[in-house]
């Protein structure tokens, strides 16, 4: 017998679980230097961390949470991204530490948008903060910036006092690294824990993984494997990653359509 998702919340919950699992699979397979995973306690709450390797934010390590709407992905409401610490950036509110996604998305469309789009946007605003506030170029050649953002002080500093902005950001980067190994504030087993590199311990995991790229990196010299992590240094690389994601997404949708048919027939 066929049951609608309206009259059977259990079926709706199962479908939501499949969607979130598909989102996680897309995230974990392609994106570099940014990691996100649903919490064990609630799949609508994701833990995330980004390692910035280039630009004026280079050396920064920022933790964040992603909160999905209760009716994700059907709800048109945008996701909520909240950083764990105060970050100097035009698009991050200094009071509640939330990222303004309104300049990137107007509403959530489940057939077009995915969590990895949001993660890629997070990478982009740190890789090119000037580009994230620019709306065009004046006849004089000066950049035209947005009239209103979440942190107007950061906007004005970036546009008019760039050296001071860079100084503040670099101080912030040092502080972020000093706290990356802090004990977690939650006992959720999916919380992303970062440990100091220990060759004796971590190389054992490398051997167990049998990953050629890791073995090649660790055999080059005595440098830590983290130095060989991929970098997002250009818009071209971001575009290539998006193309790979879209191809993978097409294959995933085919599988999901068959799965939804099977669930609806229960």
Curated annotation (Swiss-Prot):
Boundaries of every UBC core domain copy: 15-178
SMART domains (UniProt xref): UBCc
Superkingdom of the organism of origin: Eukaryota
Pfam family, one: UQ_con
InterPro entries: UBQ-conjugat_E2_core, UBQ-conjugating_enzyme/RWD
Database matches in CDD domains: UEV_AKTIP
Family the UniProt entry places it in: Belongs to the ubiquitin-conjugating enzyme family. FTS subfamily.
Protein name as catalogued: Protein crossbronx-like
Organism of this sequence: Drosophila yakuba
